[in-house]
Swiss-Prot record:
Pfam families: Ribosomal_S14. Belongs to the universal ribosomal protein uS14 family. Zinc-binding uS14 subfamily. Zn(2+) binds at C24, C27, C40, C43. GO terms for biological process: translation. It comes from Anaeromyxobacter sp. (strain Fw109-5). One of its GO terms (cellular component) is small ribosomal subunit. Its cofactor is Zn(2+). Part of the 30S ribosomal subunit. Contacts proteins S3 and S10. This is Small ribosomal subunit protein uS14. The gene is rpsZ. Binds 1 zinc ion per subunit. HAMAP family: Ribosomal_uS14_2_B.
Length: 61
């Protein structure tokens, strides 16, 4: 429940724009946010391994 309230709070327009921060829309995680994909690293990894994100492949060397 606390995570839902934090997600709602992050969506609101703040008085000072510099205080705005990104949150993962899938799980609500505030840290490790990837701007290019608009999700956190954990959700990105899970979806990439399932093949739901086009153009992303697991690297090996």
């Amino acid at each position: 429940m606390a995570k839902l309230s934090k997600m709602a709070q992050a969506k609101r327009k703040l008085k000072f724009p510099v205080r705005q921060y990104n949150r993962c829309p899938l799980c609500g995680r505030p840290r490790a946010f990837l701007r290019k994909f608009q999700m956190c690293r954990l959700c990105f990894r899970k979806r990439a391994l399932q093949g739901e994100i086009t153009g992303v492949i697991k690297s090996s060397w």
